[in-house]
């Protein structure tokens, strides 16, 4: 056994081994870069003085209640609204095939039940994916007189925000200058 190890250490790598090693290293560097971008995008970056808040939709349960992820987004929005009670809120999300109501309506009902004035909530209820959420929300905000190149607060889950920034920049031709992270289940679990 000792002899094989010493002969292996002295052996040179052939071309296919070098290529395989290079591919593995390139993959690891790429993964680390993407992971870093997602991690960076998942932190709170509230900048400026947002003129409106957008809460992106997520699954609605068969009983019409928001899913855990959606409830976390809504609770984080409610936390922010405590200090900014006059902020316009856009709830964005259509109705999936297994949902009894639109995500926007479920979010509206949840926010109103928790004390938000119905008049300050705008519903975007036609979208079925993140790209549509953002495009339709930008159109709705523009119709209501908001400049979507200014600070807009977007509420979603941390894993989602890097993609949201990219899609918002493309749709609004401006960067998302304020975002909020929400942790799934509002709990940090150690394994």
What do these predicted ranges mean?
Residues 35-190:
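A structural signal for short, hydrophobic/glycine-enriched beta-strand patches
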Residues 4-45:
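N-terminal type II signal-anchor transmembrane helix
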């Amino acid at each position: 056994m000792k002899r094989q190890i010493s002969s292996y250490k002295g052996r040179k790598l052939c071309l296919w081994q070098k290529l395989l090693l290079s591919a593995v290293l390139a993959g690891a560097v790429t993964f680390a870069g993407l992971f870093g971008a997602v991690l960076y995008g998942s932190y709170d970056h509230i900048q400026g003085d947002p003129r409106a808040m957008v809460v992106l939709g997520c699954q609605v349960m068969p009983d019409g209640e928001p899913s855990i992820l959606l409830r976390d987004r809504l609770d984080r929005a409610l936390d922010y609204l405590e200090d900014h009670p006059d902020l316009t809120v856009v709830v964005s999300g259509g109705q999936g095939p297994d949902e009894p109501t639109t995500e926007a309506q479920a979010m509206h009902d949840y926010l109103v039940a928790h004390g938000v004035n119905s008049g300050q909530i705008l519903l975007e209820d036609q979208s079925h994916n993140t790209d549509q959420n953002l495009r339709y929300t930008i159109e709705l905000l523009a119709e209501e007189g908001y400049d979507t190149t200014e600070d807009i607060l977007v509420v979603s889950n941390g894993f989602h925000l890097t993609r949201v920034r990219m899609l918002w920049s493309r749709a609004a031709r401006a960067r998302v200058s304020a975002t909020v992270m929400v942790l799934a289940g509002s709990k940090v679990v150690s394994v």
